Regions:
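Non-catalytic, conserved peripheral segments adjacent to functional cores
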Residues: 1-89, 108-154
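Conserved SET/PR-domain catalytic core that frames the SAM/AdoMet-binding pocket
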Residues: 86-105
């Protein structure tokens, strides 16, 4: 899918645990301006969301497994990949693409974004998780959704 990039993350493990770099400024043309972390229980879907002003996102699953789904709103093309413990990669999503993720397991998820969130002027828009272009990409048919994502469902 044009513009979407997989960024392999090198994980260093020993008897103490592991260490991984999840962001380097040199990976991107635009600087990441905010970092967010969420915890999601197995079966949660967050999204699909998009930003009309073109915010870019980098998604990294810090613990557990997440299924990332991206929808090109112009072409209808889709991208999906399971990331996390077994597949330590970051997924870079350029602006104006709808994106979301499903918690395949309980997970800790990190978002790096190119715009700071402004609660007075949020650039947050939704595509239903069960939109015909993406509904078959999820592993669950009865996800746990936020009120916002429930209202967006078709």
């Amino acid at each position: 899918m044009e513009g979407v990039r997989r960024i392999p993350l090198r994980r260093f493990e020993d008897e103490r645990g592991w260490f991984v770099e999840v962001h380097r400024a040199s990976w991107f043309e635009r600087p990441m301006r905010q970092t967010n972390v969420s915890f999601s229980r197995q079966g949660v879907i967050r999204g699909l969301h998009y930003h009309e002003r073109g915010q870019d996102d980098l998604f990294v699953c810090l613990q557990g497994t997440a299924r990332v789904v991206v929808l090109d709103l112009e072409s209808g093309e889709t991208f999906t990949e399971d990331i996390g413990d077994e597949n330590p990669v970051g997924i870079y999503v350029p602006g104006r693409n709808a994106h979301g993720f499903e918690a395949i397991t309980d997970l800790l998820f990190c978002y790096h974004v190119t715009e700071e969130y402004d609660p007075e002027d949020p650039d947050e828009h939704e595509v239903p998780w069960d939109d015909p272009r993406v509904r078959d990409l999820w592993s669950t048919r009865s996800p746990i959704l936020s009120d916002r994502d429930t209202r967006a469902s078709s």
